[in-house]
C-alpha cells in the first residue's frame, strides 16, 4: 500500500508542474492573448505574480489551464525570466506578423528558442 500512495503522490506533484495560464488583454485598438506554460517557477509565485499582470487601462482576463491551447503562431520555449532563475514557455496567439519583433525578443532578451508549432 505505501507504494500505491507514493505513486499517487508522484502523479499529483507532476500535475502541479503541468500548469499554464492564458492571459487575454484588451484596450482601445489592442487585443492580445498569450499563454504562459510554467517550466520552473514555484507554483504560488506563478499564480500570484506571473499570471496576474498589472496593466492599467486594459481589460485583463486570466484563465488557468493544464496546458497551453493549440493555435499559437509562435512559442518562446524555455524563456528566461529577468533577474530570476526561472523559465517558462510563452505561446503567442493572434497576429502572426508580430513574430517579426517577438522572435528577436525571445532569442536575445529571454534567451529562449523560437518555435513555430507544427514545423519541425
Predicted regions and their residues:
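Bacterial N-terminal signal peptides that target proteins for export
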Residues: 1-4
Amino acid at each position: 500500500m505505501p507504494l500505491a500512495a507514493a505513486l499517487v503522490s508522484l502523479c499529483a506533484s507532476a500535475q502541479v508542474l503541468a500548469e499554464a495560464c492564458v492571459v487575454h488583454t484588451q484596450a482601445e485598438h489592442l487585443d492580445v492573448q498569450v499563454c504562459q506554460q510554467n517550466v520552473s517557477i514555484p507554483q504560488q509565485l506563478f499564480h500570484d505574480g506571473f499570471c496576474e499582470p498589472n496593466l492599467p487601462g486594459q481589460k485583463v482576463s486570466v484563465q488557468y489551464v493544464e496546458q497551453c491551447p493549440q493555435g499559437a503562431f509562435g512559442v518562446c520555449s524555455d524563456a528566461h525570466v529577468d533577474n530570476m532563475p526561472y523559465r517558462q514557455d510563452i505561446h503567442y496567439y493572434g497576429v502572426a506578423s508580430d513574430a517579426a519583433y517577438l522572435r528577436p525578443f525571445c532569442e536575445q532578451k529571454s534567451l529562449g528558442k523560437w518555435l513555430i508549432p507544427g514545423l519541425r
